[in-house]
Amino acid sequence: MSNTDYQSFYDNFTPAVIEEQLIGSLKEGFNVCEEICDRWADGDRVGLSYEGITRPASQHTYAELKEKSARFANFLNSQGIGKGDRVAALLPRTPELMVVILGTLRAGAVYQPLFTAFGPGAIEYRLGTAKTKLVITDAVNRSKLDNDQGC
């Protein structure tokens, strides 16, 4: 986008421009997962291309992401997670992280990123400040939560 194009977009921007593109509405609300995943889940359209360092590259369709994130959202609901609850993920950048993010949004919860480079103190501070209800992690990062009394 050129500077001229950007300036024109900026000068003419209104919320109505965005709302025209949404399944839901800004006033009534919308589900972010439906907007960024479900609406594209027709056929074999690729929604995520993963280029791994420690594991093989892979591609994942929107339909696959929709199905997996729906299962994860159901899991969250079974754990008592609902609208507005904070769900953190302490995971590497993998397709599974995207499923956690989408499933959290699908459940109406708030996704809270925790970067794997954070130490235990930084993680504990963020979890406490946000009043996080659930942390999703893997075996590699689990020890970073050992001293957190809420985990």
Please annotate each region the language model reported:
Residues 27-31, 59, 117:
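Short, solvent-exposed loop/helix junctions and linker helices
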Residues 41, 50-52, 115:
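Short, small-residue-rich loop/turn micro-motifs
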Residues 42-44, 83, 131:
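Residue-level preference for short coil/turn positions at secondary-structure junctions
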Residues 102-151:
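Structural core segment of the AMP-binding/adenylate-forming
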Residues 36-39, 76-78, 125, 144-148:
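Short, flexible, glycine/charge-rich loop motifs used to bind or transfer phosphoryl groups or to couple energy/partner
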Residues 2-9, 26-48:
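A short N-terminal helical cap/helix-turn-helix that marks the beginning
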Residues 47-102, 119-124:
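Conserved AMP-binding/adenylate-forming core of the ANL superfamily
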Residues 1-24, 133-137, 150:
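N-terminal presequences and immediately downstream first alpha-helices
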